[in-house]
Amino acid sequence: MEDFVRQCFNPMIVELAEKTMKEYGEDLKIETNKFAAICTHLEVCFMYSDFHFINEQGESIIVELGDPNALLKHRFEIIEGRDRTVAWTVVNSICNTTGAEKPKFLPDLYDYKENRFIEIGVTRREVHIYYLEKANKTKSEKTHIHIFSFTGEEMATKADYTLDEESRARIKTRLFTIRQEMASRGLWDSFRQSERGEETIEERFEITGTMRKLADQSLPPNFSSLENFRAYVDGFEPNGYIEGKLSQMSKEVNARIEPFLKTTPRPLRLPNGPPCSQRSKFLLMDALKLSIEDPSHEGEGIPLYDAIKCMRTFFGWKEPNVVKPHEKGINPNYLLSWKQVLAELQDIENEEKIPKTKNMKKTSQLKWALGENMAPEKVDFDDCKDVGDLKQYDSDEPELRSLASWIQNEFNKACELTDSSWIELDEIGEDVAPIEHIASMRRNYFTSEVSHCRATEYIMKGVYINTALLNASCAAMDDFQLIPMISKCRTKEGRRKTNLYGFIIKGRSHLRNDTDVVNFVSMEFSLTDPRLEPHKWEKYCVLEIGDMLLRSTIGRVSRPMFLYVRTNGTSKIKMKWGMEMRRCLLQSLQQIESMIEAESSVKEKDMTKEFFENKSETWPIGESPKGVEEGSIGKVCRTLLAKSVFNSLYASPQLEGFSAESRKLLLIVQALRDNLEPGTFDLGGLYEAVEECLINDPWVLLNASWFNSFLTHALR
C-alpha cells in the first residue's frame, strides 16, 4: 500500500501526509491504510479549491491554469494540511476579519464567497452514515459539510453542493480512479474495511422537536426526562444493581450473578436409550446407483425413460424376500409393492411407446403403504360439541434415544470426494469490475474443491427428488405416481452420467396449506446389509432383491443387493426448501470468504490465491475427542458444506432449539477464552433449555457430542 501511495499521489501531498502522521505519533509503515486515507483527503481538499477565484465584483469564477488573471483572490482558504498551530492561527484570523463563529474542531476549508467553514469528508462507507458522524462531531450549524464517496455518491448540508457540477465530477472521477487502481493491486478490500467512524461519535447527538417529545414519552417509569435516564444509564454498575432490582420484583425471583470460570461449565447430558435411527428422506452413504454413461437413448432426459434404461443395466434380479422386517409394519405389503413396481415397469416396456409418467394401480398394498383412507374422518365441531368425553388425541412423549456411531460415519462420508463431478462451473460473463474478478476467482477455487464432494451429490439428489415430488403432487393429486430418484453427473473423463437410486411412489396430494402432508413410499437400492446396524434401519423394511457382481482386488465378487423400503411424508414447505438446497453451497462459500477476508485484512492485500494454493498450510476443521482436527483448505470447504447440507437434510425443531440455545453457551465460553470475565445467572436454566432439545434426533445428538468435545478442549 505504501508503494502505491507514493506512486499514485503528488509528492507534496505525500510529504504533508507523512508530517500529519508524525504529528499524531502514527507509523505509516504500519498504518498504511490511514496513510492512503490522509493523502486522498488532502487531494480532495486541494481539488475542491483548485481553479476557483473571486473577481473584483465579488463573484465566484473558474479560471483554468495559465490564465493571465491568475492574480485574482482565491475563493477558498485551505486549512487542511497545515501545521496545527498555523492552522488555528489562520482560523482565528478568518474569524476576526469576517465575524465567523469559531469552530470547535479544525475545519478543512473556508469559503470567502459564502462566508462559511467547510468540513470535507471522503468515505468508503455509506455517505449518509458518515455525514451524520461529521454533523455530530462539529455540532455547529455554521460549518458546512460536504461528503464524497468512492462510488460517486455525495451529500452536503441542506443539499447545497457549493461547487459547480464539473468541479465535483472531477473529484468523483479521481476517487473512482483511486479505487480502481487499489482494486487492481488487491488493496481495495482491506482499505474499504479499515475505515473507522469519527473519534468523537460518542458525544451527544442533540434530539429536538417531535423526536424529543417521543423520547420523553417512551422513558421507563420513574424517569422524568431523557437527561435523567441518560445519567442513570451512564452511571449504571451492573453487579449488585441487577440483583437488587430483581429482589424488589418478586419473592420468587432470585438471581445472583455468578462468575463464569473454567471450572463452571459441565458437559451436556446426552440422553440414554436405544440407539437413534436414520430419518433422512433418502439414503445417504448407503445408497447404490444403477448408472448409464453418455446417455443418448430415445427420450433421454425424461425421468421414466432414463430409469428404465438404468434398470436394464442390471441383470442380477432375483425373487425378493424380506431380510430385515419393519417392527410395526405389514412387511408382506412392502414386498408386494416392490413386485408391483417391477411388474408395471415390465408392462411399460412391452408397450409400443413408453409414456412420460407412470401412475401405479391402486392396489391394497399401496393403499396401506400410502395411508389411503387412514386419516380420521373430520367432523364439523357444531355436530359434536355436545359429546361429553370430547378430547384431543393422546400423544406419547417421544422416546429418548442415544447417540449412535453411524451418524458420525455418515458425516465423515459426506465430507469425502467421489470420482464424479456433481456441479458445473457457472457460465458467467466476463468480469467488469476488479471486485467481480476476485469474486469469480473465489467461486472457481471453491467450486473446484467441492464439485466432487459427496455432500454436493446429496444436494443435487435432494433438489431433484423434491422438485419431482412437488411437481407430481400438484400435477397428479389423486394418482399414485411412480417417481424415479435420479441424479446427473460427469465422470473424471468428462463423460455425462445418469444415475438411478430407486423409486418413490407418492400418495394422494391435495396440498392446500404449506404444512399439509403428502405420503410417499421410497424404495432405494443398496449394498449395505441392514443386519450389521439394525438400529439404524428401524423405520425400514429391507428386502434382498438381487446379486451384484463387483470388481475387487481378487477379481469379481458377488454381493447381495438390497432394497430399503419405508413409508415417509413431506409437505409443500419442506419440498420448497429441499428444492433450494443449492443454497448450502452459497452458505459455505460465504463462511470461507469471511476466512479469506480476515486473512487479507491482516496482510493488507487479497489473499485468495495464497489461501487456496498454499497446500502445506492446515486449518482448524472441528473438535473431536482427540482435540482440534486440522486439514487442508479443501477439507475445510467440504466440511463446512457437509454441515450446511446436514442442517438441511436433518432440519427439525430439535435442531432449531439446540442451535439457538447452545449458541448462548458458546458465546459465554468464547468470552471466557477472550478473558472478558463473563458473569451468568440461571446457568442451570440455560443448560435445561439446551438439553430439552436432546431427544432422539441423530444430527442434534452428534452436534451435542461435538459441543462437549469443544468444551473439554476450550477450557483446558
Curated annotation (Swiss-Prot):
Its cofactor is Mn(2+). Mn(2+) 1 binds at residues 41, 108, 119-120. One of its GO terms (biological process) is cap snatching. Keywords: Cap snatching, Endonuclease, Eukaryotic host gene expression shutoff by virus, Eukaryotic host transcription shutoff by virus, Host cytoplasm, Host gene expression shutoff by virus, Host nucleus, Host-virus interaction, Hydrolase, Inhibition of host RNA polymerase II by virus, Manganese, Metal-binding, Nuclease, Phosphoprotein. GO terms for molecular function: endonuclease activity; metal ion binding; RNA binding. It is an enzyme of class 3 (hydrolase). It comes from the Viruses. It is found in: Host cytoplasm; Host nucleus. InterPro entries: INFV_PA, PA/PA-X, PA/PA-X_sf. Its main location: host cell. Pfam families: Flu_PA. One of its GO terms (cellular component) is host cell nucleus. Binds 2 manganese ions per subunit. Disulfide bonds: none annotated. Phosphorylated on serines and threonines by host kinases, including human casein kinase II. HAMAP family: INFV_PA. Influenza RNA polymerase is composed of three subunits: PB1, PB2 and PA. Interacts (via C-terminus) with PB1 (via N-terminus). This is Polymerase acidic protein. It comes from Influenza A virus (strain A/USA:Phila/1935 H1N1). The lineage of its organism: Viruses, Riboviria, Orthornavirae, Negarnaviricota, Polyploviricotina.
